[in-house]
């Protein structure tokens, strides 16, 4: 997920589908094994362009979409984590450190903020909550 968020942030990717990650990773691993001279991020970016992008979009997913998915929806949960990592990569931060430093209860805080601003893009809410 970190690699996908990083490549998307750095190379204009906007979609995420957590259900595609395992198959996409397997495909990228095969290509990298056959062509070790190619960079991992380059291969990932190339393969993701041809892959299903999913319903979750960086700038189009609104709080109401997350709320409608329900608080036990794994896809929505992983999209929230991915979007946070995407935003950190876009700002030049270390994604791994940022993900390790997410405070306990952060998801609940995002849910509460989204309930107050259902029409807001989720990315805007995450950025506002970080003081960006």
Model-derived features: positions:
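Short N-proximal segments of mature Sec-exported proteins
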Residues: 1-118, 124
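Short, solvent-exposed mixed-charge patches
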Residues: 131-132
């Amino acid at each position: 997920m970190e690699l996908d968020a990083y490549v998307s942030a750095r190379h204009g990717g906007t979609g995420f589908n957590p259900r595609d990650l395992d198959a996409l990773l397997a495909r990228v691993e095969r290509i990298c094994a056959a062509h070790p001279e190619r960079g991992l991020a380059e291969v990932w970016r190339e393969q993701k362009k041809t892959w299903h992008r999913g319903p979750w979009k960086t700038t189009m997913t609104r709080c109401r979409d997350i709320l409608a998915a329900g608080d036990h929806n794994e896809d929505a949960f992983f999209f929230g984590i991915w979007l946070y990592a995407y935003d950190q990569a876009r700002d030049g931060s270390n994604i791994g450190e940022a993900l390790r430093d997410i405070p306990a209860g952060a998801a609940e805080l995002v849910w509460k903020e989204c309930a107050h601003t259902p029409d807001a893009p989720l990315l805007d809410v995450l950025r506002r909550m970080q003081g960006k």
